[in-house]
Amino acid sequence: MSKMRFFALQELANRRPLEVITPSNKLSDYYGSHVFDRKNMQEYLPKEAYKAVTDAIEKGTPISREMADLIANGMKSWAKSLNVTHYTHWFQPLTDGTAEKHDGFIEFGEDGDVIERFSGKLLIQQEPDASSFPNGGIRNTFEARGYTAWDVSSPAFVVETTLCIPTIFISYTGEALDYKTPLLKALAAVDKAATDVCQLFDKNITRVYTNLGWEQEYFLVDSALYNARPDLCLTGRTLMGHSSAKDQQLEDHYFGSIPPRVTAFMKELEIECHKLGIPVKTRHNEVAPNQFELAPIFENANLANDHNQLVMDLMKRIARKHNFAVLLHEKPYSGVNGSGKHNNWSLCTDTGINLFAPGKNPKGNMLFLTFLVNVLMMVYKNQDLLRASIASAGNSYRLGANEAPPAILSIFLGKQLSSILDEIARQVSNSKMTAEEKTTLKLGIGRIPEILLDTTDRNRTSPFAFTGNRFEFRAAGSSANCAAAMIAINAAMASQLNEFKISIEKLMEEGVGKDEAIFRILKETIIASEPIRFEGDGYSEQWKQEAASRGLTNICHVPQALMRYMDNQARSVLIGERIFNETELACRLEVELEKYTMKVQIESRVLGDLAINHIVPTAVIYQNRLLENLRGLREIFPPEEYEVLSADRKELIREISHRVTAIKMQVREMTEARKVANHMNNYKDKAFAYEETVRPYLESIREHIDNLEMEIDDEIWPLPKYRELLFTK
């Protein structure tokens, strides 16, 4: 194995950047060329078929079988112009990845000749095996049927020689088995609820859209080094490795010069993204060595989520071409920053109003304040649901580690905006307001845009921060499907807005004027949600104590965090807003707990294998060298001098012996703990057992191995070290 390490380093020394040729100097010449967007639809579809698609997207009008056949034929003609040979229903099962089965267009004609055909039936629906994907017990092998159904709101696209059709994935009995189905439901729920509230201010608003801008962080490592690290290959993270003498302490990597090989990779990635209509705009070095970020312009949340899933797949494929491996794990290296995926979330009306941006007049600012205050209450009431949506084995290594937001949910608004809310709460009277009081309030509200101009500072320790015209949810992990967080946020927002509107209508029924009713409910909501507002250092120990006194929860135990999906509040949101039914919600919880269990189980097995088969033998080899050295010293030096000269080597032999013994003993204990957990029939008990009795061994065994790495001859150490993984360019 040590030979493989040095071969990898030698191979890396000979790497050169690949030449990447841009299709055209003009981005617009090839942007969206591989997407069946409206421009291509207009060219390849008859007018009536094009109208059927646009009506389905904008109004939800069903597409007839006749129109589906016309659309499928036009889609096939467009795809053939790009040399496509196969098509697939592209969907997002509960695996944090995507799935696809490629079928050719080949069919037999009536006379037995081979023809190429793509019908509306094949476009609209297919039947993959639902039992082979995570399903929480909904589907068994003997009842395996599931359906994929075309999501007309997300355009088809071509990757290499395959036409990919975005679809939802449901069981034969109708339960959702993917991320897209509940995401579409959550977006529809917040659309309706937000539109109803908007119409209290502006009857011209008939729809509200959810926008998402994700920021994808990732690490790159040379493929030769990656292949020499079995833990990276099998788990996505290093299960052992002593910190490099230099890591990120000089803060010289963030926004630094991008290495040429990485630039070539980024350039090709951007070209492929632009062909697929993914509006990537920003690329830069991140804080940790060999860590980078890619970010697009925001889009409709459903399309943005599809694009993020596609980007993660593109990254892996293009990285291989450039002799890299892309690491999307939240914490691939201990001791340096991990990777997240910030979700920039906003709501926008069909009249062009960003509901999280101050308006141009008091009326517009009232609308802004209404939605701002409802976000505060939404997060306060649903902190456990939001945490559950981002809880995972990988993300738990990152959250609360002085590099990412803590597991405590709070909102940062900035002092100026917080003081405005406090002033509104102070000025609004509990009794009937006078005309003068209303005027004073409206004048103060009218000043919001000038107050907020360049005053919304950035608090990097806040998990849910207002950044001027959007909220940035920073707790999501880099490998996660954005849909999980977007489902929770939008469903919770829909529920909160519905409650807000009901409260206002109740006051209006009692004879209170609309404006005054809005002011009163805003005051109540501002006061009730005050504990969720925090402007300070989210990393500090003082905040943990203060958060507890405010009634905010701090759950770092992953299975416990996931169990909050079944709390009354989470159920009232997810089931009450019809995002999930009882069966689907129970299925989600089971899948997430099983996923957590399997990831810890794999890490445990890999660590045990590497420890016993690679590290311990290396330690024994070096120990034998030391013993041979002692024998040589005894032969040369007189006893008294020998004792002095050999003392340090004896101590090192003793140290290595103790650590080898500890490693073997703890691997044995970890294996026994795993066996006990594996015999548990209840998936909840199993997840808790892995968290509490198996996972602690990962750190304790690692500590011994990392110390051995610093004691054993570098020439025989079997695995690439952190300095090589992080600093070889």
Predicted regions and their residues:
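Active-site proximal loops enriched in glycine and acidic residues that flank catalytic Cys/His/Asp
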Residues: M67, F91, S119, P296-F298, ...
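Short linear, low-complexity motifs centered on an aromatic residue
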Residues: D96-G112, S131, R229, G236-T238, ...
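C-terminal amphipathic alpha-helical interaction region
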Residues: T525-K729
